[in-house]
Amino acid sequence: HTFAPTGTPECVKSSAQFGDDWYGPYMGFDHVEMMLLGHNWFLPEEPPRGQHYERWFFADGRGHEKNAAYQQNGRDTKGAAQTHHSMLPVAWHNSTWTADRAIAWMRDRPEDAKPFCGWVSFPDPHHPFDAPEPWSRLHAPEEVDLPEHRTRDFEGRPWWHEAVMTSEPAGEAEHANIRKNYSRIPPQSDAQLREIIANTYGQIALIDHQVGRLMNCL
């Protein structure tokens, strides 16, 4: 994230400079398809901002409907921080889109093509803990094993660990709000930690499924 335009395609404030027909080359790759953020605390940018995922997300005119579905919580999560069972259909999730685009790229290659390198990067697992249903329900929170050490402890850690979590963020109000309400997670109860971990397992399982699709294509 940057506070000013950088002129590069991954920058939110510069992304509108890159048209619908831009696919690289960039950063050593001949063909590039990108999403700007992928962590859905920041909803997909509406065109003309955004990159390939965001433009696809809004292309059918239902982008705001999809965002509303994402923000619906399918069940109680005991107040766990940044945790919900997203009602966004899996077909629109960025993990699915990432695999879809990689598979399409591989299938478009000629049969006599040289060996290739494809970098397929999934944004998850990451907070917010927002696996879509039914993946979010694969692991029962009450069956999650908790780590032995799970309370906040700054003793013996570099000074900046505590500073990051407890100091008043500097800068503009928008950026300070992000530091307070997104980058930081308050202490959680055991029940809340189980909700967070179970949902994270759902994110990982969805990625495992997409990797399986990639392997089948290969």
Question: For each of these PLM feature ranges, what is it?
Answer:
Residues 1-88:
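Catalytic-site neighborhoods of secreted/periplasmic enzymes
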Residues 1-12, 121-126, 151-161:
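Short, solvent-exposed turn/loop segments enriched in Gly/Ser/Thr/Pro and often Arg
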Residues 22, 26, 95, 99, ...:
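A structural signal for well-ordered alpha-helical scaffolds and beta->alpha junctions
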Residues 75-89, 175-198:
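Short glycine/proline-rich turn/loop motifs
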Residues 92-110, 146, 186-218:
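A long, amphipathic alpha-helix that forms part
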Residues 104-152, 180-195:
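Active-site His/acidic residue clusters
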Residues 141-162, 168-175:
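Mobile, glycine-enriched helix-loop/loop "lid" segments at the mouths of ligand-binding/catalytic clefts
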